[in-house]
Amino acid sequence: MRLYLSLLFLLTITISGVNGQKTTVLGKITENITNNPIPYVNVIFKDTFTGTMSDLNGNYNLSSVNPTSVIEVSAVGYKKQSFTIKLNQVNNINVLMVEDVVSLGEISIRLGENPAIPLFRKIVAHKKENNPSSFPSWQSRLYSKSEIDIKNVNKSLSKKKLMKQFEFVFRYIDSLEVQGKTFLPVFFTETVSNYFHNATSNTNREEIIANKASGMTTDMITQFTGKMYEGINPYDNYIMISDIGLISPINSLGLQFYNYYLRDSTMLNGRKIYEISFKPKNMQDPTFKGKFWFEDESFALTKLEMQLSTKANVNFLNNLTYSVDYQSKEGRWVPRNESLIADLDIRKDKDSEKIGIMGRKTNVYQDFKFGEEATVTKVPKNAIIVSKDAIKKDDNYWNAARPFELQKRESGIYAMVDSIKTVPLYKTIAEYIYMFYYGYRDLGKIELGPYYSVFSSNKIEGNRFRIGGRTTMKFDQQWRLNSYGAYGNKDKEFKYGGGLEYYFSKKPRLMVALQGSHDYDLLGISSNAFTRDNILTSVLSKNPYTKLNMINRVQATIDKDWIRGFSNQLYVTSSHIESGPLIPFLDQQGNLIPAIRTGEIRLNTRYAPKETIMVDGFQRSTFGIFNPVLNLAVTSGIKGFLGSDYEYLKLDMNFSDKIALNPIGYITYYLQAGKIWGNIPWPLMKIHEGNESYAFDAYAFNLMNYQEFVSDTYVSLFLEHHFQGFFLNKVPLFRRLKWREVVGVRSLVGNYDQTQHAGFVFPQGMTGLRSTPYTEFSAGIENILKIIRVDAVWRYNYNNDQKIKLGVMFSLQLTL
């Protein structure tokens, strides 16, 4: 992954575009008898995906830098016509359309009728029985080939001083231009796997038995190259790409989003096949244009070609092209070949000469088996299994496993990328990209960081300086050590922390750890907030941190994965929490209580059934866009255990999920509930998450102060609806901005038993909740300049004193 990021960074800052000659065809299309203009006539370059349609006045204009010498003109109810054109110049061709009769079995459709609509309804009616995901059980041998390229690369750049070290790379520029662009490959991988599907249990399993990648051979890369990370099934109503639900052309409600046109019919192996083209009704909707073919008996797709609407409200994607051919096996139509091309730009516009990224993937399915033959027992759960020798296959294996030979250029990519890793400039760039992404500077056996905590400031410490580090896989494959030290120029006290981790297994995880620290901390801060010593916390904070306590903490941890999506974490913790300099611990007589000590055992159970975990060394990432997550924690404080002063029991549950509501976006929610038993002081109660910064926090009450409310019984709900531009896409002024609407509500019900406070009094500004729920509402715009979100937040109640009732908050997010 570091190699891939480094190549993109290096080439992006140094490469400029190239120019190509353009061929243009324009004119007017009219009916041959009445001479009336005909709208929505298809005009395409023959044997390409490049085409257009005539407008309401019958005019058309088609241009390309990679055309063919023939255009085809077609429309339902008219005879198809072809015209030869001259390349690299403007061609003016007016077309007279001649009426035709299209025959569909016993039905004759004449001019003015649309035969595509009843046929489309038949396809929808038979979707379930034709959807491969609905077949009871099947398996297939799958070959996948993936490539990532830098597009619009000029070979003359190899002569520039900065690129001299990479001169050999430019020999691999693709000499075959695709859609008028040149490409320099920077990543190439092949995968052979056995793919299993069980519709009854709605589970998939992929066993990756061979993988060959261009210089990158980690498990994380290997798992991403298989089948389970595509998620494209045309039979689904919506094709999920990140948070965006792209509307399938055979969506059950497709007639609301697409216009369909019957174009042709042919015979294939004794079967009659019809061709239907489609285009979006609203180009700003996340829709496609293209065509599909289907069999007239089963109404199953036999082929599909589609391209994302160029005006769709999807970030960075200039083009997304997908095609699939189906084959008939045992009376079922299943995929044979799939092709996916993604054209990405930082700026999505019509300038085809800008530097960008092109991703290509090809899948070939072979050896289908159904029912008992598909060894259904091998699909007990969703999983990706990587064979231990997957990256060790030799050339003889790959020559036999490939369904077709690699191009000479493709074969050379492996050697090219391996050579890049030896270039000094590459190594330097890779180090800085890793530092930016992970927050640590890699020095070999150790990493220094995180860099964003090197400097910060607060009311107690003044200017705080910190240095820390951790070991890497080069130090040890199973042991990981970490430590840090910090010093404030105001309190003039040294703070420190450190720990060690031991991994019996990284996947599934079995890890034990011991961590200790002597440092200030803010009780009750959101887990989603910037860390207290993050420099951004100092910059974005409305008020300097004052509510800090010195905490001496030692914690032992056992972390165990049982099955996919199910894990436990056991914590044994000793804490010594000192009275804060500005938030002292006081009893009811006003006497200072210097500190409180706790010893507790906590067991957390985590269940995320749709979550996928990627492991790369010590790095662990979780994936699952629409992934429900349940956490259940039981904490027992035992008086006398590790010197604890208190006896208590805590039960806390939280559940989060994201629900697709296509085509009107999606909802996210976070539900938390808990109960605490025991006579304990307020620092051990539930301190509800406030936010005193200008940064919007999705898991905090954004107009609640830190440590403003505490409870021993509580229920809270955070809910947001992201409309993904559903309304603004229909407003002419805003649709070009591609802004997206978001609304939210945050509410909290809590109770505090005033007889169970261990003699502590609340500090100034803290209280318990009354019977009325605390509530905040928010409304905002996201996707401003693709990365900015702005929310107006309204505090509905508990507005006594000088509390802020209305605020405007900002956040950054990077999504499609």
Describe each model-derived feature in a short phrase.
Residues V41-F45, I71, I109, S140, ...:
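Hydrophobic beta-strand segments
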Residues M1-K28, V43, V70, V101-I107, ...:
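Bacterial Sec-dependent N-terminal signal peptides
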Residues F45-D47, V70-F83:
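A short, solvent-exposed loop/turn motif at the edges and junctions
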Residues V101, E106, R110-I273, K279-T287, ...:
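Structured extracytoplasmic
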Residues F49-N59:
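Short, acidic Ser/Thr/Gly-rich low-complexity loop/linker segments typical of extracellular
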Residues T23-V25, N32-D47, N66:
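Short, ordered, surface-exposed loop/turn motifs in non-cytosolic proteins
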Residues V25-E31, G58, V95:
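A short, amphipathic beta-strand motif
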Residues I244-L246, K378-L816:
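Exposed, low-structure sequence patches enriched in small/polar residues
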